[in-house]
C-alpha cells in the first residue's frame, strides 16, 4: 500500500496540513527546525501510535492544544483504506479505520509496514539488545499472525512474575506463572530464530553491496543457554531471580549480534559505514517482506545526506528506487535529493510548520 493523502492537525509545530502524496519519492526540504522531520514523525505515528522522538504525547501535541489528529488514505492494489489516529495529552488514543472506531494500534502497524532511518538510528547497531530485538520483532510481527498476541501475553506474564518474586519464598509458588510463560517464551524464540535464519541471506547480499570491504556475520541469541530447556533455566535461577526481583533469562534478554571481520560492528565501522549498514539492514528487511507477502514498506529517511558521500547517497537512492516502494526523504537542501527526483516524485518545502509543494 502507499499513502496517497496525509492530513496533520496540531502535531509538533504543524497546525494544519493536507498533503497529496506520490506513490514513489516524496521529498521534504527545509532548514533545521522547519518541521520537515515532524512530517516524517506524523507518518510514523500514524502507523505506530507513538512518535519516534518522544514517548510522551504531550510533547508532540502543538502548544496549547489538547490533542493531535492524523488521517491518511492508503491505496492498495484492489481497494483504498482510510485510517485515523487521535491522541490526547493523557495518552488516550482513538483509532479509526474505514470510518469505524474501536480499532487497535497494531492494526495500523499491520496496514502500514514501514522502515525508519534517522541519524539516531545507530542504536540498532551500537545500542542495547532491545533495539536489535525490536528489529527481529518487526519481522516476526509482519510474518507471523500470532506473534503480537504471544508477545503481549509474554510481557504481561513477565510483569506478574517479577512482582511475585518479591512475595514468594519457594519456586513452587511461581509455577502458575511459569506454566503459561514457558510455552510462550519457546514459541517466540522459535519465531525469532526462524526469521533471523530466513532473512540472513538477504542481509548478507545487501550488506555485501553496501560494504564490500567487510565480511559481516549475524547470530541470534535467544536469551538463555543453548540446548537447555527454559523450564530448567527458570527453576535453576529462582534464588538469583528472587534476589534481583526480576526474571534474568528469557526472550526479553535475547540479542541479534552483528560482527564485521569477527569484531562487533560498533568497534570496527566508521559512522558513515554504520549508517550504510543500518540502511542495508532496513532495505533487506523490507525486501524480504515484499518477497514473502507481496506487501511493500514505506521508507522514512530523515536527514538523507548526513554521514554519506555522493557515491553512497547514489547507491542508497538506486536501491530504494528498485524496491518500487513509497519513500519519504527529508533534507536541508534540494541539491541533496534533486538527482533522485523523477516525473513521479513530489517536492515539498517546509518552513515554520507550513508545507507547500
UniProtKB/Swiss-Prot annotation:
One annotated GO molecular function? ATP binding
- Which keywords appear in this protein's UniProt record, sorted alphabetically? ATP-binding, Cytoplasm, DNA damage, DNA repair, DNA replication, DNA-binding, Nucleotide-binding, SOS response
- InterPro entries per record: DNA-binding_RecF, DNA-binding_RecF_CS, P-loop_NTPase, RecF/RecN/SMC_N, RecF_2
Which residues of the sequence carry a binding annotation for ATP?
A: 30-37
Q: Which GO terms describe its cellular component?
A: cytoplasm
Q: What is its main location?
A: cytoplasm
UniProt GO BP: DNA replication; DNA synthesis involved in DNA repair; double-strand break repair; SOS response
* Subcellular location, record wording: Cytoplasm
Give the top-rank taxon of the lineage listed in the UniProt record for this protein. Bacteria
Q: What is its biological role?
A: The RecF protein is involved in DNA metabolism; it is required for DNA replication and normal SOS inducibility. RecF binds preferentially to single-stranded, linear DNA. It also seems to bind ATP.
Family that this chain belongs to: Belongs to the RecF family.
Q: Which HAMAP family match?
A: RecF (MF_00365)
The name this protein carries in UniProt is DNA replication and repair protein RecF
- To which species is this protein native? Salmonella agona (strain SL483)
Lineage start = Bacteria, Pseudomonadati, Pseudomonadota, Gammaproteobacteria, Enterobacterales
